[in-house]
Amino acid sequence: MTINPVSRKVAWLRVVTLAIAAFIFNTTEFVPVGLLSDIAESFHMQTAQVGIMLTIYAWVVAVMSLPFMLLTSQMERRKLLIYLFVLFIASHVLSFLAWNFTVLVISRIGIAFAHAIFWSITASLAIRLAPAGKRAQALSLIATGTALAMVLGLPIGRVVGQYFGWRTTFFAIGMGALITLLCLIKLLPKLPSEHSGSLKSLPLLFRRPALISLYVLTVVVVTAHYTAYSYIEPFVQNVAGLSANFATVLLLILGGAGIIGSLVFGKLGNRHASSLVSIAIALLVVCLLLLLPAADSEAHLAILSIFWGIAIMVIGLGMQVKVLALAPDATDVAMALFSGIFNIGIGAGALVGNQVSLHWSMSAIGYIGAIPACAALVWAVLISRKWPVTLEEQPH
């Protein structure tokens, strides 16, 4: 460890600032889900056409995570964070100014570049910066920042977009990032790269069947979730025939349930992670199958969203903990791969939802999403039986 001993208060401040950064990065990835209709209206496009922006963003992150991580593997981490935040902020200013849809997509690609690097180093940085014996809590704090992006970031971003225009949402995120950057500059010491891995560690990781199986499970289950979730805002308004305000409330409920999922996993994850993930995937299958039937009332959709939010948070946390446990010798490479694979799933799900909405009916997004969700459930049960001991390992 190259960090000088510091007080627990300062150590926690560093981790909290990193968690706030995680909140901001996740908010900007997810916030277009709540703004699709507004963006489409301003550029005179169909909502589903604008939705392709979600796929482009996610796939840029997927493709660039590993190359960027390797390119920056020897770079001092504090300096790297400053550079990626500058790119992140500048790209949000361009989003605010975007004079056509193409410029907006270009700005989102810039944000995706910053995102790709950020998520490949965040988990390992949180572990390094945490007070002694508090590594698991530090990771949990980063996960909470991620959860809050769905609980608060996405709905608040949508409310700001409704009342002040979607451009203001992106500008506000950029300003939040600027404040966070100033805090990081003030708080962080120099952080030489360590345990970053290199291309040499790739064959080693790919020779771990339990890890590869987790990656496959991740892409399939994330595709299932985002097939429906990417278009939940227009689904609520156009299929269920409910108000724009209720769409905001529903996003708030779904995100808030994620906090419950985080608490459940924090309580039971150490001993029963594999079982929890399988149960959560089964719950996701049920939620997707019931999405259209639940569209007959606000109450039914609200109840469904609670279970959906709990399920996806448990799945996400379970996958991340397992990846870190199975690759303690190359955390940055393993997490860069995980981030890339997760985003392949986001992009694939958003694209499937896009095609279903354009060429079939938006009402079918739940049923179509349930197909890969069922496949994921079978795969989750199979791998938990094949590697029951390995998959229960936890990072120490």
Curated annotation (Swiss-Prot):
Molecular function in Gene Ontology: carbohydrate transmembrane transporter activity
CDD domains named in the record: MFS_NepI_like (cd17324)
Its membrane topology: Multi-pass membrane protein
UniProt lineage: Bacteria, Pseudomonadati, Pseudomonadota, Gammaproteobacteria, Enterobacterales
Name of the protein described by the UniProt record: Probable sugar efflux transporter
Predominant localisation class: membrane
Entry's Gene Ontology cellular component terms: plasma membrane
Parts of the chain that traverse the membrane: 15-35, 50-70, 81-101, 103-123, 136-156, 169-189, 209-229, 246-266, 275-295, 301-321, 333-353, 363-383
Cellular localization per UniProt: Cell inner membrane
PANTHER family xref list: PURINE EFFLUX PUMP PBUE, SUGAR EFFLUX TRANSPORTER
PROSITE patterns: MFS (PS50850)
Domain of life: Bacteria
Protein family according to the UniProt entry: Belongs to the major facilitator superfamily. SotB (TC 2.A.1.2) family.
Species assigned in the record: Salmonella newport (strain SL254)
Pfam families xrefs: MFS_1
Key words of the record: Cell inner membrane, Cell membrane, Membrane, Sugar transport, Transmembrane, Transmembrane helix, Transport
Protein purpose: Involved in the efflux of sugars. The physiological role may be the reduction of the intracellular concentration of toxic sugars or sugar metabolites.
